[in-house]
């Protein structure tokens, strides 16, 4: 669709809240409630943002946003390969993200944005949907499983 010039400037999809990856997300995270998972693409050849809004008071232990960040950072510090394909970025005051920043890479960035007053957070993953995509993630998962 992009090559044919038929893509909207920005488009969220899976708005039926039944994205095909939700069963895997539930399995891998141990969540008992389905998260609101809304991926989006735009009028650029490669790149995407995946957003997962969270109500912090509904999570076990009612964590703060900093706790989510620290848990993600600790997990990826243990499981990342030397290439550091997944990076958990520190909190920032810049509340905008460009979806195409990681074009032509196998990188994935995770960031937690939050409003502690309202006990809400959004976990955002930024990736090149073609560079990272299913095949890049599969290779990364195989390396993890094999201890490489």
Language model features with spans:
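C-terminal substrate-binding/catalytic lobe of Rossmann-fold NAD(P)-dependent oxidoreductases
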Residues: 1-123
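NAD(P)-dependent Rossmann-like dehydrogenase/reductase catalytic/cofactor-binding core
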Residues: 107-148
């Amino acid at each position: 669709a992009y090559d044919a010039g038929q893509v909207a400037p920005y488009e969220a999809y899976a708005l039926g809240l039944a994205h095909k990856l939700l069963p895997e997300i539930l399995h891998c995270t141990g969540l008992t409630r389905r998260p609101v998972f809304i991926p989006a693409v735009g009028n650029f050849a490669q790149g995407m943002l995946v957003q997962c809004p969270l109500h912090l008071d509904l999570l076990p232990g009612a964590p703060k946003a900093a706790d989510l960040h620290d848990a993600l950072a600790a997990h990826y510090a243990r499981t990342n390969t030397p290439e550091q394909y997944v990076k958990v970025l520190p909190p920032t005051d810049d509340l905008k993200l460009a979806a195409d920043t990681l074009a032509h890479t196998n990188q994935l960035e995770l960031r937690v944005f939050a409003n502690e007053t309202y006990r809400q957070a959004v976990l955002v993953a930024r990736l090149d949907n073609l560079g990272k995509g299913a095949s890049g993630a599969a290779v990364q998962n195989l390396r993890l499983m094999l201890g490489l």
